[in-house]
Amino acid sequence: MRLFLSLPVLVVVLAMVLEGPAPAQAAPEISSTFERIPDKLKEFGNTLEDKARAAIETIKQSDIPAKTRTWFSETYNKVKERLKTAFS
């Protein structure tokens, strides 16, 4: 049953790929592409910076770091006590 469904989908995708790009999707000249690279990189860097700052602020304002430190401290102390009682 899956084969009957996947074959028509494969045929449609293959037809779309072989058809080629639409006129509006035609590749621009290589020189204009190279001219836009610095702007695109700057835009990417700014976007990445904004997202990183937002993520760091979210982490700073959340309780997760404090809870994690507390959990690790408690677990470490429990293991330490168990080892003390086991080897004394």
Swiss-Prot record:
Keywords: Lipid transport, Secreted, Signal, Transport, VLDL. One of its GO terms (cellular component) is high-density lipoprotein particle. One of its GO terms (molecular function) is fatty acid binding. Its main location: secreted. It is found in: Secreted. Residues 1-26 form the signal peptide. GO terms for biological process: lipid transport; lipoprotein metabolic process; negative regulation of cholesterol transport; negative regulation of lipid catabolic process; negative regulation of very-low-density lipoprotein particle clearance; triglyceride metabolic process; very-low-density lipoprotein particle clearance. It holds the Pfam family ApoC-I. The keyword Signal applies. InterPro entries: ApoC-1_sf (IPR043081), ApoC-I (IPR006781). Inhibitor of lipoprotein binding to the low density lipoprotein (LDL) receptor, LDL receptor-related protein, and very low density lipoprotein (VLDL) receptor. Associates with high density lipoproteins (HDL) and the triacylglycerol-rich lipoproteins in the plasma and makes up about 10% of the protein of the VLDL and 2% of that of HDL. Appears to interfere directly with fatty acid uptake and is also the major plasma inhibitor of cholesteryl ester transfer protein (CETP). Binds free fatty acids and reduces their intracellular esterification. Belongs to the apolipoprotein C1 family. This is Apolipoprotein C-I. The gene is APOC1.
